[in-house]
């Protein structure tokens, strides 16, 4: 319908309406006092005239002029601030506006009239309210005509009723828009979510307008209405009523009375503010298209509206992130980071609550609660106590809500005051929102603010004045001029320890103490870039350096004046010339760069270098400042052996005389760090920032590749300090010196793939092999020997820890301990922390060790050299990948590694498969003597479960813990925590008893009454009692054979690469053995020929000169000593490959001999030649006897036979021999350990039995106290579909997670309620697992006491590493017999090595009242067999042959089963082969069942790979 008056024609009103057709309601007919008072003269309307001026001059005012009564309309115009706010322009205030000219939202300082803005807003809110009255409403049109001073607001949807009010005798549109104190919101019993409340609203807009036009059309009343008011609602025109079309709408057009607002026109500020309000409505009104000046506002919803704000800002260059959530139909909330204190944008029923209110507090408080716990956890190491308002200061909250009957602090409705309980709805933020909120940057912003606050506190501790004398800093040797006017010329020397300080002080004697100060650092400086402020504030070295240098945190030192406040003008680092010394230099540079980068740019930092090697010959002295420089000199100097070589591993090696020499040649030893631009800044940041992990990886990877290439090309290593080096850039220092420490840090932390060792472990093994001790040796003594033999330059305490770790054999440590633990080396009680002092415990090589590292391999390894001393090899080469046998953990620079343990016997089989050219079988983590269960979640994760069983309605028994969960920690952190109660919850457990030993676990736990039933209904007991963990294989990082770090995706990949390296060594070993045997054979042949020639007088040596003897032997074609020559060739080959030259005793003697004492070259040559034939001429005369002659000839023939045997053998044969020898020795060693463990358990049980009170009756079983109870109902751990799907989803790429959900495995069969067939109570997943075992290729001898299952999965990629203590949620599991836990093993191979066994004879059923006698070390029948055999069948089922690959069955114990409730007879068909031996548990009503006791393995056979099981060992109940 058109807006023009011409379209309205005067027609008769509808019959049902009583108002006259065209008659205007005169003022006389209006009975309302307020309306009568609305008829005023021009003088009456001039309400802004000052009352004080009415009287004029000084004439005293009349009482009537002082005390006046005003009408409602007069009061509104006279005191507008009560109703619409101020009518004065505000001061320039930052506000969000929409710039219509540039079409963008912006925040700028504006000045506007709040009253004018309010009357516009009242009309806009009315339009938005109509959406609540009529959900079909979908359009709002806003027009702001600046030139005409005209604003219109149109909305469709249900119009105003066009009918006469029967009480007030006026039309309803006129009543609600032209009569004060009228409203539809006076019924407080009606719950409304609209903006109107007090009955002013649009009337205020009418009153403050020179013209106000209302147009509405009502489809229900089939009429359209139009009326105009002028002169501040004091005059109104006749309403025009016409028949309407089918359209419903309402339109308000008004011209604000600018004079009342002291304005001449609608300025840009108010227009832009009104435009932004239009955008508010568009964002807060769902399903409504809003048009502004004819153009649709492009906002689809509240989230789009929020992004319109946040897109104006960024966080460290990235767009601001938002967390958004719609809660129900009435709440929409969003959160973003605020850098300007707490900000909020909120709407209540479309009203813009610019000052917030209780709705904003309600939402913001929830958001703060989400953050405060995580932030407090991060601040645990600091002294800061964060408050909620401090978090709130970094939040930008957006709220759009619908509130029932809201109340406000004033008519301006800027603050909502309604209490939260009256909102009519709740807004509970979800975990999904919390997760999104954690990524918007608020936590980081709060932490940054905390650091700033702490920095401010730190700065308060800094000295504000420059002083020449300092007190309270121990060991400081202050420069005399420090802190004076000459302080810029002073240099502070930071030394690495007290010994280096002594060296520096000695050197100062030649340069003076006026300009140089010395301060020793204790160890390595803190990495301040990643340390928290509390660490920095508490760090003595940092505080001392700041005080000595006169630094202040708040100063940047960018100006000369600031720089002059320092006590020293230079900082010089004097550290050892090794990698750790480089790290100290880097940390000092990092300290200055982090807080005062401008000092780095001023070249404030220097270093003092000292020689690492000196070569001396007479008065000539050559100094070398890096090992590569020394190696290069040695290669280019023919007579280098004539020099005396001395290595300087630390500054303490230098003498005071040498210190003076260093300081005299300050030009050579003083190296300045030169700033060379942003590249230097980036290099320092990359080396020390936690955020640059990936960059550090790339940096180190590139360096390792370059090192490998140079090595392959035979090039020397690069070094930083040449003879003419006077300065280095920070980038060069990081890339060419600091990188050496970072690589060394990785070598110390991450093992090598080939031998699985870190350098310390390799040194220990090298020393043990070299010592070849036949007797046990004290650990402390062995550590000292290792340091001496292998040139170990660090503390021996670390070596002692390494030795102890190599000898530990408790569950979760080593699968094969290479050293024997003779004494207390730690147990699973405290994870090895309970080991005795190294002074009291002994060790020696394990018999298994040399079978893993054959002595023959020592001849083909590449040994390292240090200080001309042959030390450990680059890596050993065991016969199987030891890194998989014992696992590995470590955190280096840029990388970390975590590799679980695997079964050595399975590794032997995989190696044999590779030798035979067959593919490997999949491996699962395996830990020696672990009685729990390991189930595969996906290709890179395994769930590790402990063991729990139910003893009665309120008692459970825990007999195994997950890997790496130590007994003492479990008791303190889990069980004691479950004993705590709260007001709302009773404790889970009331008591527990401990029966474990140092090798076994047993907790008997008493639960609160009824708690067990409650837990079983809701959760898995493994979850409740923290008996589950996750083992990840996603972080398997190792050094390869070439010394480069690589990431491996599976143990099979590691085995394959190991196989390639090991194969090459077997080829080399064969070549070496052939060479040495051939040399020995040749030597014996020469000796035999020489003896025969001497006997036959063909050789006469008596009374001849040495030279003549040599000539005779050469003439008769006797070879120079073949063995000696061959060994010398091998030694030279090794030295050439290593790039080192080892000085033997002759070389060392030659160096000490002066030139004038040297023997002639001719005589020396004769001596050398004669020594080559000493093996002939040096033989004893007894060798000429017939017996010795024949013995020599026989030895020669035997040696030739050995050569022929070796020639026939392939490298495969050599490897097979080593593997078989290893397995044989391992079996013997484990048998000895098992015997010792059984004896230990038996002794412990006897002690417990003796201590217990015993009554009359049969003797108590001594093993029941420490071993699993025979009557326990084992809870079978299972991985349910939901958990598996969770990990599959975690491992998918982000895009794939949305599009494609992982395929869930089939749900296990559910346990039926009582009355079902008892066989259904067994573990539902067992039959499926058994079927998969064969296809997956598992072998039952993988473990006798662990349980490993593989489930199908997809290939994933994950960054998780380590054994995580995680809730692997699974459904409640059925219970099975306790004994089944100890031998459930999955066969990882297809080898049919276990022969089928005949079924065992049937067993008799026991009376039900008698408890089943479980063997604590026995297993039961397989679950697969149970499904095939009903236990309640009336007819006895025929015996079936055992499956081909089934485990051997054994005789049963008497009274194996419990009889039925009706009688004590044996159930029909229940024998060992046909009955699963399930009986209904006493607590049958709960729906649980108990698996009957397992059988003893009395006389079972064994295959070649599995040692014969002893009586009482477990029968594998689930393997094929």
Swiss-Prot record:
Control of topological states of DNA by transient breakage and subsequent rejoining of DNA strands. Topoisomerase II makes double-strand breaks. Essential during mitosis in the adult germline and during embryogenesis for proper segregation of daughter chromosomes. Required for centromere resolution during mitosis. Required for chromosome segregation in anaphase of meiosis I during spermatogenesis. Promotes cleavage furrow stability during cytokinesis upon the presence of chromatin obstructions. Disruption phenotype: RNAi-mediated knockdown results in embryonic lethality. Disrupts proper hcp-3 localization on mitotic chromosomes indicating unresolved kinetochores and inhibits centromere resolution. Causes a chromosome segregation defect during the first embryonic mitotic divisions without affecting cytokinesis. Leads to increased localization of the condensin component capg-1 to the spindle midzone and the midbody and to chromatin bridges with enriched levels of capg-1. Increased levels of phosphorylated air-2 at the spindle midzone, indicating activation of the abscission checkpoint. The record marks 839 as: Transition state stabilizer. It is an enzyme of class 5 (isomerase). Residues 1-40, 1249-1520 are annotated as: Disordered. One of its GO terms (cellular component) is cytoplasm. PANTHER family: DNA TOPOISOMERASE 2 TOP-2-RELATED, DNA TOPOISOMERASE/GYRASE. This is DNA topoisomerase 2 top-2. Homodimer. Interacts with nmad-1; the interaction is required for localization of top-2 to DNA. Interacts with gcna-1; this interaction allows the resolution of topoisomerase 2 DNA-protein cross-links. One of its GO terms (molecular function) is ATP binding. SMART domains: TOP2c (SM00433), TOP4c (SM00434). Residues 1-10, 1342-1364 have a biased composition (Acidic residues).
């Amino acid at each position: 319908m058109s807006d023009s008056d011409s379209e309205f024609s005067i027609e008769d009103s509808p019959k049902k309406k009583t108002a006259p057709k065209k008659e205007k309601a005169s003022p006389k007919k209006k009975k309302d006092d307020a309306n009568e008072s609305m008829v005023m003269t021009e003088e009456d309307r001039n309400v802004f005239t000052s009352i004080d001026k009415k009287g004029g001059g000084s004439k005293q005012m009349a009482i009537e002029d002082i005390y006046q009564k005003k009408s409602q309309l007069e009061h509104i115009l006279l005191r507008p601030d009560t109703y619409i706010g101020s009518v004065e322009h505000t001061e320039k205030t930052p506000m969000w506006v929409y710039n219509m000219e540039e079409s963008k939202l912006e925040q700028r300082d504006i000045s506007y009239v709040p009253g004018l803005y309010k009357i516009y807003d009242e009309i806009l809110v009315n339009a938005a309210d109509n959406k609540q009255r009529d959900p079909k409403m979908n359009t709002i049109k806003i027009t702001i005509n600046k030139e005409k001073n005209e604003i219109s607001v149109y909305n469709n949807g249900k119009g105003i009723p066009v009918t006469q009010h029967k009480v007030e005798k006026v039309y309803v549109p006129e009543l609600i828009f032209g009569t004060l104190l009228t409203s539809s919101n006076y019924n407080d019993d009606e719950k409304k979510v609209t903006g109107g409340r007090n009955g002013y609203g649009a009337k205020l807009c009418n009153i403050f307008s020179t013209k106000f036009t209302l147009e509405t059309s009502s489809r229900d009343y089939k009429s359209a209405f139009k009326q105009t008011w002028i002169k501040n609602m004091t005059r109104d025109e006749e309403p025009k009523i016409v028949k309407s079309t089918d359209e419903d709408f309402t339109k308000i057009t008004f011209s604000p009375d600018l004079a009342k607002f002291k304005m001449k026109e609608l300025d840009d500020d108010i227009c832009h503010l009104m435009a932004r309000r239009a955008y508010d409505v568009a964002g807060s009104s769902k399903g409504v298209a809003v048009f502004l000046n004819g153009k649709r506002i492009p906002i689809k919803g509240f989230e789009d509206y929020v992004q319109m704000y946040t897109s104006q800002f960024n966080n460290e260059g990235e767009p601001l992130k938002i967390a958004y959530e719609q809660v129900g139909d009435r709440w929409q909330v969003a959160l973003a980071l605020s850098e300007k204190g707490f900000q909020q944008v909120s709407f209540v029923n479309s009203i813009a609550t610019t000052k917030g209110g209780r709705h904003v507090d309600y939402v913001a408080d929830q958001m703060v609660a989400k953050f405060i716990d995580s932030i407090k956890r991060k601040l645990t190491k600091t002294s800061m106590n964060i408050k909620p308002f401090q978090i709130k200061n970094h939040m930008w909250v957006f709220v759009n809500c619908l509130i029932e009957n809201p109340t406000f602090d004033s008519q301006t409705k800027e603050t909502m005051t309604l209490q939260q309980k009256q909102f009519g709805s709740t807004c509970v933020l979800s975990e999904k929102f919390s997760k999104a909120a954690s990524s918007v940057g608020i936590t980081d912003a709060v932490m940054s603010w905390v650091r700033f606050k702490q920095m401010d506190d730190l700065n308060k501790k800094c000295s504000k004045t420059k002083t020449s004398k300092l007190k309270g800093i121990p060991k400081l040797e202050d420069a005399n001029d420090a802190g004076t006017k000459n302080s810029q010329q002073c240099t502070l020397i930071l030394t690495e320890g007290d010994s280096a300080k002594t060296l520096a002080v000695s050197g100062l004697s030649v340069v003076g103490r006026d300009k140089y100060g010395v301060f020793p650092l204790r160890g390595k400086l803190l990495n301040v870039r990643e340390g928290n402020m509390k660490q920095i504030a508490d760090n003595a070295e940092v505080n001392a350096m700041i005080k000595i240098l006169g630094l202040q945190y708040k100063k940047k030192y960018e100006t000369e004046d600031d720089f002059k406040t320092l006590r020293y003008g230079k900082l010089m680092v004097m550290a050892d010339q090794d990698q750790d010394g480089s790290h100290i230099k880097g940390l000092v540079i990092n300290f200055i760069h982090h807080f005062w980068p401008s000092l780095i740019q001023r070249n404030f930092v220097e270093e003092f270098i000292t020689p690492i090697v000196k070569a001396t010959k007479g008065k000539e002295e050559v100094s070398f400042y890096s090992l590569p420089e020394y190696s290069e000199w040695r290669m280019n100097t023919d007579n280098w052996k004539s020099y005396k070589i001395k290595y300087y591993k630390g500054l303490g090696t230098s003498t005071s005389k040498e210190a003076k020499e260093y300081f005299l040649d300050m030009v050579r030893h003083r190296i300045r760090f030169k700033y060379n631009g942003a590249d230097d800044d980036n290099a320092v940041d990359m080396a020390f920032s936690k955020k640059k992990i990936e960059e550090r990886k790339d940096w180190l990877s590139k360096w390792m590749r370059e090192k490998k290439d140079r090595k392959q090309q035979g090039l020397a290593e690069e070094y930083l300090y040449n003879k003419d080096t006077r300065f280095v850039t920070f980038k060069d220092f990081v890339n060419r010196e600091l990188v050496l420490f970072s690589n060394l840090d990785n070598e110390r932390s991450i093992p090598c793939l080939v031998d699985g060792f870190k350098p310390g472990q390799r040194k220990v093994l090298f020393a043990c092999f070299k010592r070849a001790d036949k007797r046990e040796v004290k650990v402390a003594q062995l550590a000292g020997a290792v340091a001496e033999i292998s040139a170990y330059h660090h503390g021996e305490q670390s070596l002692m820890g390494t030795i102890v770790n190599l000898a530990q054999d408790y569950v979760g440590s080593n699968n094969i301990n290479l050293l024997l633990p003779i004494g207390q080396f730690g147990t699973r009680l405290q994870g090895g922390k309970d080991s005795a002092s190294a002074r009291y415990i002994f060790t020696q090589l394990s018999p298994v060790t040399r079978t893993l590292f054959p002595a023959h391999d020592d001849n083909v390894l590449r040994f390292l050299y240090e200080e001309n001393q042959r030390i450990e090899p680059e890596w050993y080469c065991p016969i199987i990948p030891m890194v998989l046998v014992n696992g590995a953990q470590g955190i280096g620079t840029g990388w970390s590694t975590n590799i679980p343990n695997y079964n050595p016997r399975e590794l032997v089989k995989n190696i044999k498969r590779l030798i035979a050219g067959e593919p490997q079988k999949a491996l699962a983590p395996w830990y020696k003597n672990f009685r729990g269960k390991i189930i595969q979640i996906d290709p890179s994760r395994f769930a590790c479960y402990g063991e729990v069983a139910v003893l009665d309605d309120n008692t459970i028994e825990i007999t195994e813990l997950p890997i790496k969960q130590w007994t003492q920690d479990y008791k303190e952190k889990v069980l004691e925590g479950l004993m705590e109660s709260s007001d709302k919850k009773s404790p889970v457990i009331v008591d527990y008893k401990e029966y474990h030993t140092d090798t076994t676990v047993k907790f008997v736990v008493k639960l609160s009454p009824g708690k067990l039933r409650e837990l079983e209904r809701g959760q898995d007991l493994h979850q409740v009692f923290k008996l589950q963990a996750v083992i990840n294989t996603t972080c398997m990082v190792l050094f390869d054979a070439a010394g480069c770090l690589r990431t491996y995706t599976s143990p099979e990949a590691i085995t394959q690469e190991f196989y390639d390296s090991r194969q090459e060594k077997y080829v080399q070993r064969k070549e070496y053995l052939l060479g040495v045997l051939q040399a020995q054979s040749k030597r014996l042949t020469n000796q035999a020929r020489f003896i025969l020639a001497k006997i036959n007088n063909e050789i006469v040596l008596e009374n001849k000169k040495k030279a003549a003897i040599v000539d005779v032997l050469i003439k008769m074609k006797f070879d120079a000593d073949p063995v000696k020559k061959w060994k010398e060739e091998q030694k030279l080959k090794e030295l050439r490959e290593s790039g080192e030259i080892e000085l033997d005793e002759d070389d060392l003697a030659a160096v000490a001999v002066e030139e004038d004492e040297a023997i002639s070259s001719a005589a020396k040559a004769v001596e050398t030649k004669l020594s080559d034939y000493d093996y002939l001429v040096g033989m004893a005369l007894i060798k000429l006897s017939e017996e010795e002659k024949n013995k020599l000839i026989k030895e020669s023939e035997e040696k030739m036979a050995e050569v022929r045997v070796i020639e026939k053998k392939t490298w495969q044969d050599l490897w097979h021999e080593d593997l078989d020898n290893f397995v044989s020795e391992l079996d013997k060693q484990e048998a000895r350990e098992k015997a010792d463990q059984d004896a230990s358990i038996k002794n412990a049980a006897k002690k417990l039995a003796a201590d217990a009170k015993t009554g009359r009756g049969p003797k108590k079983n001594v093993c029941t106290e420490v071993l699993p109870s025979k009557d326990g109902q084992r809870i079978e751990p299972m991985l349910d579909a939901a958990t598996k799907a969770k990990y599959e989803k975690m491992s998918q790429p982000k895009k794939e997670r949305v599009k494609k959900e992982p395929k869930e495995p089939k749900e296990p069969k559910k346990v039926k309620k009582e009355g079902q067939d008892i066989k259904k109570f067994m573990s539902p997943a067992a039959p499926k697992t058994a079927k998969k075992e064969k296809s997956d290729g598992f072998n039952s001898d993988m473990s006798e006491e662990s349980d490993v299952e593989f489930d199908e999965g997809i290939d994933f990629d994950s960054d998780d590493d380590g054994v995580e203590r995680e809730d692997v949620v699974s459904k409640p599991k059925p219970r099975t017999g306790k004994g089944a836990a100890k031998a459930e093993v999955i066969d990882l191979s297809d080898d049919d090595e276990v022969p089928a066994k005949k079924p065992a004879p049937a067993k008799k059923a026991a009376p039900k009242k008698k408890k089943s006698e479980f063997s604590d070390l026995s297993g039961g029948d397989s679950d697969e067999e149970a499904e095939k055999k009903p236990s309640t069948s009336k007819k006895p089922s025929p015996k079936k042959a055992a499956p081909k690959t089934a485990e051997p069955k054994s005789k049963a114990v008497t009274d194996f089963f419990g009889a039925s409730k009706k009688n004590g007879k044996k159930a029909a068909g229940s024998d060992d082969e046909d009955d699963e031996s399930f009986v209904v548990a006493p607590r049958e009503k709960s729906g649980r069942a108990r698996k009957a006791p397992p059988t003893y393995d009395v006389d079972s056979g064994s295959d070649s790979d599995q040692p014969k099981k002893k009586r009482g060992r477990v029968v594998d109940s689930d393997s094929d």
